[in-house]
Amino acid sequence: MAAAAGPSSSVKESLPPALGSTSQPPPVFDGTTRLYICYFCPFAQRAWVTRNLKGLQDKMELVAIDLQDKPAWYKDKVYAQGTVPSLEHDSEVRGESLDLIRYIDSNFDGPALLPEDAAKRQFADELFASANAFTKALYSPLLSHAAVSDEVVAALDKLEADLSKFDDGPFFLGQFSLADVAYVTILERVQIYYSHLRNYDIAQGRPNLQEFIDEMNKIEAYAQTKNDPLFLLDLAKSHLKIA
């Protein structure tokens, strides 16, 4: 099956409150599939978006964790690393967002989020392999309070070129795929941070990137997970100490 072209979710769910240090744990390993996230974490958002794209709202329970007031039971009973996202499934807990979104795509019903085309799948593997380096390149100047670096410009220019590799759509593999999920939650944040803190528009002069962002914002399964931009900025200032 080919990757879906811009799938969306029409399911409007009532989001559960985030669980803090005084909360009780869910009945772990009772056979329920649970996705543990934080509403404001870009890595957890990847898994959340993937869940929505697959239409798993009724099959994968969302459990929100308050990372600023993390319950001890999360690390003790659920996921020893204590990070989000994690997935409780088949009596095991898995983590690491880039691995997890591929696991969800491969092991649950719903539209396939990676193509069968060999060239596109190979490029998807390359994009996944580069995702952490891209994140580091974009966040490093913000965390060190430095100016827009050559590394930032080069990383964004590479992304612009990557978005032109296939001409059958505005996404990394032409048509929408899981590779887009791997990058969009990071782009959502750095676009805000660089605009407000460096007066730098990451999409300026990069029409492919601008179109990618515009098209991603039309996908409901992603749009449902977005936060208010100024809230994300304030949160990053206070907790990541970006400036």
Curated annotation (Swiss-Prot):
<protein>
    <recommendedName>
        <fullName>Protein IN2-1</fullName>
    </recommendedName>
</protein>
<feature type="domain" description="GST N-terminal">
    <location>
        <begin position="31"/>
        <end position="112"/>
    </location>
</feature>
<comment type="similarity">
    <text>Belongs to the GST superfamily. HSP26 family.</text>
</comment>
<dbReference type="InterPro" id="IPR036249">
    <property type="entry name" value="Thioredoxin-like_sf"/>
</dbReference>
<dbReference type="InterPro" id="IPR004045">
    <property type="entry name" value="Glutathione_S-Trfase_N"/>
</dbReference>
<dbReference type="Pfam" id="PF13417">
    <property type="entry name" value="GST_N_3"/>
</dbReference>
<feature type="region of interest" description="Disordered">
    <location>
        <begin position="1"/>
        <end position="26"/>
    </location>
</feature>
<feature type="binding site">
    <location>
        <begin position="96"/>
        <end position="97"/>
    </location>
    <ligand>
        <name>glutathione</name>
    </ligand>
</feature>
<dbReference type="InterPro" id="IPR040079">
    <property type="entry name" value="Glutathione_S-Trfase"/>
</dbReference>
<dbReference type="GO" id="GO:0004364">
    <property type="term" value="F:glutathione transferase activity"/>
</dbReference>
<dbReference type="InterPro" id="IPR044629">
    <property type="entry name" value="GSTL1/2/3"/>
</dbReference>
<dbReference type="Pfam" id="PF13410">
    <property type="entry name" value="GST_C_2"/>
</dbReference>
<feature type="domain" description="GST C-terminal">
    <location>
        <begin position="109"/>
        <end position="240"/>
    </location>
</feature>
<dbReference type="InterPro" id="IPR036282">
    <property type="entry name" value="Glutathione-S-Trfase_C_sf"/>
</dbReference>
<feature type="binding site">
    <location>
        <position position="70"/>
    </location>
    <ligand>
        <name>glutathione</name>
    </ligand>
</feature>
<feature type="binding site">
    <location>
        <position position="84"/>
    </location>
    <ligand>
        <name>glutathione</name>
    </ligand>
</feature>
